[in-house]
């Protein structure tokens, strides 16, 4: 039995990194792994007005139902004026003892970071979710990068080639049948675009709605699940007629009911992606995907031949029109989306890769 500890600030939130760790922890076979997940609620930052998403009850329920032992600790502040982003007034070290574990699983940015820079004996498997920062810590035996682009950047920043492993984000996809919102919102005969995003102004992109404004007709609609309030303001300013906004949620059934409603996933994010959970979820429904260029370009690798990545809203609008009016192109993108999900992103494939890594580092 391998004893593994997951550690994450705000670890039961519905952000992408948090959901990755929650899914790995939940889906590991419990006849082979004893899984403890250390987490705290969101806390204010010192040195930034950024607000981390807080604990979501549905994510707590999900991991508990799958045999994960949740261990909650307290943090009063996260001090990002310190290079290691220290946790201030925390009882973490009262509840966590590294000698109790065979492996530590992280989900972090890449630079030396609290509390992992103080865990120096137990083997660490890092999951890195930003790019351009690398740390070669002696007991960090494997570093999981979530896209080829990110892996290349991590190695270029000084990361060890031997430690680097590319594994996409693991996602649990519920079976909800054909349940969708079309009848509820009287959208039965419309061609529907949509975007799912956390409520965060820092990642708001104006491009999807700017593009949709160019092509909107009485026979189209755009549905936003979650997302920054800036989207709602933008939709109002543009005078969009068929724009629907659904509240942020961590409940998988609602997310996938939303995705069942769409014809095309209209992705946008100001800083780009490494490996987007939202795009993977969309592909699990065989949805074609449109996106745009950004500083990080993991979305290009993800989408592949399941859609297009363009530079601005005018080109984005042209692809929207092609999706609507070129049936052969649209069907090809749907087929390719499903194939990419089955071949690359299916949960069972991803979890098996993590199992192999954990067994490897324990045997070192």
Describe the predicted segments one by one.
Residues 3-5, 182, 186-203, 209-212:
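Conserved donor-binding/catalytic core segment of Leloir-type glycosyltransferases
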Residues 8-14, 30-83, 227-231:
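N-terminal strand-loop element at the rim of the active site
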Residues 85-88, 106-111, 128:
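Short His-centered aromatic/hydrophobic patch
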Residues 140-176:
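Donor nucleotide-sugar binding/catalytic pocket of nucleotide-sugar-dependent glycosyltransferases
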Residues 232-250:
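Nucleotide-activated donor-binding/catalytic signature segment of Leloir-type glycosyltransferases, i.e.
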Residues 260-274, 287:
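Acidic donor-binding loop of glycosyltransferase active sites
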Residues 304-314, 322-327:
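Conserved acidic donor-binding segment of nucleotide-sugar-dependent glycosyltransferases
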Residues 325-359:
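A charged, aromatic-enriched C-terminal amphipathic alpha-helix characteristic of glycosyltransferases
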């Amino acid at each position: 039995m391998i004893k593994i500890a997951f550690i994450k600030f705000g670890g039961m939130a519905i952000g992408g990194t948090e959901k990755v760790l929650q899914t790995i922890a939940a889906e590991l076979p419990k006849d082979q792994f004893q899984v403890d997940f250390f987490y705290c609620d969101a806390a204010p930052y010192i040195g930034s007005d950024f607000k981390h998403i807080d604990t979501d009850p549905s994510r707590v329920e999900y991991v508990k139902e799958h045999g994960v032992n949740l261990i909650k600790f307290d943090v009063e502040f996260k001090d990002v004026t310190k290079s290691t982003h220290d946790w201030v007034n925390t009882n973490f070290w009262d509840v966590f003892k590294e000698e109790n574990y065979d492996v530590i699983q992280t989900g972090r940015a890449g630079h030396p970071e609290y509390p992992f820079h103080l865990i120096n004996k137990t083997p660490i498997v890092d999951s890195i979710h930003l790019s351009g920062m690398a740390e070669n810590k002696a007991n960090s035996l494997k570093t999981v990068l979530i896209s080829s682009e990110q892996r290349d950047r991590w190695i270029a920043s000084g990361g060890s080639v031997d430690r680097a492993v590319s594994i996409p984000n693991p996602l649990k996809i519920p079976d909800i049948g054909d349940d969708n919102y079309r009848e509820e919102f009287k959208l039965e005969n419309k061609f529907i675009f949509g975007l799912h995003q956390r409520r965060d102004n820092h990642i708001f992109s104006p491009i999807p709605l700017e593009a949709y404004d160019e092509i909107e007709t009485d026979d189209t609609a755009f549905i936003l699940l979650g997302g920054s309030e800036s989207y709602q303001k933008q939709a109002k300013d543009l005078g969009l007629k068929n724009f629907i906004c659904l509240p942020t949620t961590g409940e998988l059934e609602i997310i996938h009911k939303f995705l069942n409603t769409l014809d095309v996933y209209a992705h946008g994010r100001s800083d780009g992606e490494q490996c987007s959970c939202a795009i993977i979820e969309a592909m699990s429904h065989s949805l074609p995907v449109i996106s745009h260029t950004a500083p990080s370009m993991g979305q290009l690798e993800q989408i592949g031949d399941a859609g297009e990545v363009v530079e601005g809203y005018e080109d984005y609008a042209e692809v929207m029109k092609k999706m609507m009016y070129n049936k052969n192109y649209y069907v090809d993108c749907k087929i390719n989306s499903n194939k990419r999900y089955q071949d690359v992103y299916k949960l069972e494939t991803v979890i098996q890769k993590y199992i192999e890594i954990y067994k490897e580092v324990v045997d070192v």
